[in-house]
Amino acid sequence: MFVSAQRPADPKTGALVKGSLKEMATQCLDNVEAVLSELDLTLSDVTKVTVLLAGTDDFSAVDAACEERFPRPMPACSRVQVVSIAQGAPVAIEAIACR
């Protein structure tokens, strides 16, 4: 299952959530988890994530959010600094999951 990049958007309104970079990364992970649950998958099934970060090269906040949410062993992770993300989001996370 390929989950396309999830921005830190409220699933009800589509508006970006406010907060720290870690809080925004957590919302991205909430959105990834919601997509996975539609196919009866969980974050435990994720084998690879790609983190897109715009406007900063401080990946530590995103790493902290991922460490809190993913079980061990953590999935493989690529971190990519980009010029921009849709709606001006500072972070987006995509995932690959399988059973």
PLM feature segments, named:
Residues 1-99:
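Short, polar/acidic, helix-capping and beta-turn segments at strand->helix junctions
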